[in-house]
């Protein structure tokens, strides 16, 4: 009987040892797949750098919005003096949205708990010949910038057409401000504005000439075509 117990104990020990070895091997292979099959995790140092960048972006954008909201009355007065009533109404709506954004970004944020901080960079994009890297959150925001730019551009172009004003997207208040939909997160404001203006220019052209070359209309709104957006953004995957 004692001999049977000893044999059973040995068999059990071997089974446990084999199971542990198998689990350790799978765990090791899993780690290897994590690095080989995808980007490495964001280091603690890079996480701290991102937190600092996000804090600085928010500070800068709050200051920018404070200045812009103060300047809206002057811009509206200029449009009224030029008798551009359609553009004046469009500018009022744009100013109201900026005021809402100003309220939204006043809330405090716990940056360390935000998924953006630990999400690896997987995309590369270009601004003025300079390459940048970003993660899924930044890529989604770039797409939003282009689409919002197109929508606001269409409205501005349509307003200038109705006012019988010259083709002049570069002096449209929304084009100059160019942060509609930005929240001080994921991207530098200048990068967001760059792509917002790319969408705006095309939307303005469609609105001014009363056509849909670069976008489509649905439910009373306008959005840029997917292939046009892809051509503007030209995101590449980081290998």
For the regions a protein language model found, what residue spans apply to each?
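C-terminal segment of classical bacterial N-terminal signal peptides
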Residues: 14-22
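Extracellular, intrinsically disordered low-complexity regions of secreted proteins
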Residues: 11-12, 61
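Bacterial N-terminal signal peptides that target proteins for export
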Residues: 1-8
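Glycine- and aromatic-enriched low-complexity segments, predominantly in secreted/extracellular proteins
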Residues: 21-239
């Amino acid at each position: 009987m004692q001999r049977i117990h000893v044999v059973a104990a040995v068999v059990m020990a071997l089974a446990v040892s084999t199971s542990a070895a198998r689990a350790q091997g799978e765990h090791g292979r899993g780690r290897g797949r994590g690095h080989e099959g995808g980007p490495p995790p964001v280091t603690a140092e890079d996480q701290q750098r991102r937190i600092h960048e996000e804090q600085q972006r928010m500070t800068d954008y709050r200051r920018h919005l404070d200045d812009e909201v103060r300047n809206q009355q002057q811009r509206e007065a200029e449009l009224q003096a030029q008798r551009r009533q359609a553009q004046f109404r469009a500018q009022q709506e744009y100013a109201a949205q900026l005021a809402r954004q100003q309220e939204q970004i006043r809330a405090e944020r716990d940056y360390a708990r935000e998924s953006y901080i630990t999400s690896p960079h997987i995309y590369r994009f270009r601004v003025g010949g300079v390459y940048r890297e970003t993660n899924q959150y930044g890529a989604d925001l770039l797409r939003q910038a282009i689409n919002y730019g197109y929508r606001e551009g269409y409205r501005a172009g349509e307003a200038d057409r109705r006012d019988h004003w010259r083709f002049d997207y570069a002096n449209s208040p929304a084009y100059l401000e160019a942060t509609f939909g930005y929240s001080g997160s994921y991207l530098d404001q200048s990068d967001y504005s760059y792509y917002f203006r790319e969408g705006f220019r095309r939307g303005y052209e469609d609105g001014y000439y009363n056509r849909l070359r670069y976008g489509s209309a649905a439910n009373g709104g306008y959005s840029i075509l997917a292939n046009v957006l892809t051509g503007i953004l030209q995101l590449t995957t980081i290998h």
